[in-house]
From Swiss-Prot:
Gene3D superfamilies: 1.20.1260.10. InterPro entries: Ferritin-like (IPR012347), Ferritin-like_SF (IPR009078), Mn_catalase (IPR007760), Mn_catalase_dom (IPR039377). It comes from Bacillus subtilis (strain 168). Belongs to the manganese catalase family. This is Protein CotJC. Pfam families: Mn_catalase. The cotJ operon proteins affect spore coat composition. They are either required for the normal formation of the inner layers of the coat or are themselves structural components of the coat.
Amino acid sequence: MWVYEKKLQYPVKVSTCNPTLAKYLIEQYGGADGELAAALRYLNQRYTIPDKVIGLLTDIGTEEFAHLEMIATMVYKLTKDATPEQLREAGLGDHYVNHDSALFYHNAAGVPFTASYIQAKGDPIADLYEDIAAEEKARATYQWLIDISDDPDLNDSLRFLREREIVHSMRFREAVEILKEERDKKKIF
């Protein structure tokens, strides 16, 4: 189906240890609009979508896992040299007590990932509109992370991710039009 290369989809650099920024980035790791939710949503929906757009959901769903890997790398690099005191001051004390430096799927507020973040209606057009909304929410979150970040190296990677969300949204919009045209061909008056 795909080939894994032992490199990130886009390079991730950070300027300095910054557990506070890592805490915010965790939103895209285990939050409702994050990369894990997107990957699982798209790969699940592909089983009830017409053949014409299955490949799109597969391609974007697997790319979301590459984005998840980038976010994990960012969080790791931003926290790898942090002391327990720095983690506590950044609001990651609860995380440290439960997971030490291990990543865990939760949002920036510490709420664990849940399947309720994922939607699959079974109506292909409805599901694609859900996917468009998911991509637009992710795009907005990446913009807000860029706005709050003071790390120019990290912002480069965040801009890459933001732009990929825009591309995904556009591709899902194209898929909606394909399915609408197909649906309209079947109407008999």
